[in-house]
Design a protein with these regions (language model features):
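Solvent-exposed loop/turn segments at secondary-structure junctions
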Residues: 56-60, 90-95, 115-118, 140-142, ...
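Conserved redox-active cysteine motifs that mediate thiol-disulfide chemistry
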Residues: 54-71
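N-terminal targeting signals for export/organelle localization
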Residues: 1-32, 144, 172-182
Length: 182
């Protein structure tokens, strides 16, 4: 008889290797939404900081959050930070995913939904409900997560950590007037 704690234990033991692969798996699974389909895309080179945005078309708080996410992302990129958002859809269909990205004018890539379902490390980061934001570095290390186990810390702590780390990059010239997320 199998125990339900065994998969969690195996994932915990394998976490360093899984974390190292997470950035690479995300980078290898990127898609660009087009009106009728998702098309593969590649980064050259991949950014050093990735904000994984877990959301869905059916989620009202997700719709409310996207303008803030887009504003922070655009400000960081304009400042020269090497960072990008990747959307991880929790929608039931590719059509809903594309509709949500189009309605919200998301300029960033989306993770291939079929591949995302086969990434246990990614699924473990999603949290119990959307929206969620997870910041990872080039080694796949999780730097901030809106969910800590079953406790929802919220999106603001992740946005603040993202701003701090992105602005600490040598090439970034972030404004000193406190434009960071509130």
């Amino acid at each position: 008889m199998r125990s339900s704690w065994l998969p969690a234990l195996l994932l915990a033991l394998a976490w360093p290797a899984v974390a190292a692969d997470l950035h690479a798996q995300v980078s290898a699974s990127l898609m660009r939404p087009e009106p009728r389909a998702l098309r593969p895309m590649q980064w050259s080179p991949p950014p050093t900081l990735i904000a994984l945005y877990f959301g869905a078309d059916w989620c009202a708080p997700c719709h409310a959050f996207v303008p803030t996410l887009r504003g922070v992302r655009d400000a960081l990129r304009e400042a020269g930070a090497d960072t990008e958002v990747v959307y991880v859809s929790l929608d039931e269909s590719e059509a809903a995913l594309r509709r949500y990205m189009h309605l919200q004018q998301m300029p960033w890539p989306v993770l291939d939904p079929r591949r995302a379902q086969r990434m246990p490390a990614l699924q473990a980061l999603a949290g119990l409900a959307p929206p969620n934001l997870v910041l990872i570095d080039a080694q796949g290390t999780v730097l901030a997560n809106g969910w800590q186990g079953r406790h929802y810390r919220g999106l603001q702590p992740v946005l603040q950590e993202w701003w701090k780390r992105a602005c600490a990059q040598q090439q970034a010239h972030c404004p000193d007037d406190g434009v960071q997320p509130r």
